[in-house]
Regions:
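Glycine-rich phosphate/pyrophosphate-binding loops
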Residues: 1-18, 170-172
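Residue-level preference for well-ordered alpha-helical positions
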Residues: 4, 160-161
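Hydrophobic alpha-helical positions that pack around
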Residues: 24-151, 163-164, 169
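Short, structural beta-strand-to-alpha-helix junction motif
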Residues: 153-158
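Cofactor-cradling patches in redox/metallo enzymes
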Residues: 17-22, 152
Length: 173
């Protein structure tokens, strides 16, 4: 909602990949609760700002991580990248209108940045790559999970073997 408010948008779409059934259930419940509490919908928190959120269940193709493929899927087409030019959905996006596409990782940074400031956020990471990055690691590691690390500071070796993260390969193989 922060991004919608900042940009003056009245409609947002949440695209959830088809194979993520549990995420779909949880997001649908969260949306219902947010509408009921007045955090989304008409006149949010008794203001003149209104935004509706549409959740779209995708077919489950990895390629829809590419922003124009995601837009194609939202439009009910096969989720394949669009021919370019135009290169950016900000020029011609969903239903031919200017469109902003952000992922969960990007949007999850907004509350922290708003509360603490962009200069404080830039203190994380390296000078050439400020900020943090989230890694979802599964498979044959001792502690699978989602880990937030600083750009340019944490190595993949640390991510996989450090006690603060994955703690190494399962069965030490």
């Amino acid at each position: 909602m922060i991004a919608c408010y900042a940009l003056g948008l009245s409609q947002a779409f949440l695209y959830v990949r088809g194979e993520m059934a549990l995420a779909q259930e949880r997001i649908a419940l969260a949306l219902d609760e947010a509408y009921e509490a007045g955090y989304i919908g008409k006149n949010i928190l008794d203001t003149k700002f209104s935004v509706d959120v549409v959740m779209h269940w995708g077919a489950g193709a990895y390629i829809v991580g590419e922003e124009t493929a995601l837009i194609e899927s939202l439009e009910g087409k096969r989720g394949m990248p669009r021919l370019k030019p135009p290169y950016f959905p900000a020029a011609i996006g969903l239903y031919g209108k200017p469109t902003i596409v952000n992922n969960v990782e990007t949007l999850s940074n907004l509350p922290w940045i708003l509360n603490n400031g962009a200069s404080a956020y830039k203190k994380f990471g390296s000078e050439s790559s400020p900020g943090t990055r989230m890694f979802a690691i599964s498979g044959h590691v001792k502690r699978p999970g989602v880990y937030e690390v600083e750009h340019g500071v944490t190595t993949f070796r640390e991510l996989f073997y450090d006690d603060n993260f994955c703690r190494g390969i399962r069965d030490d193989n």
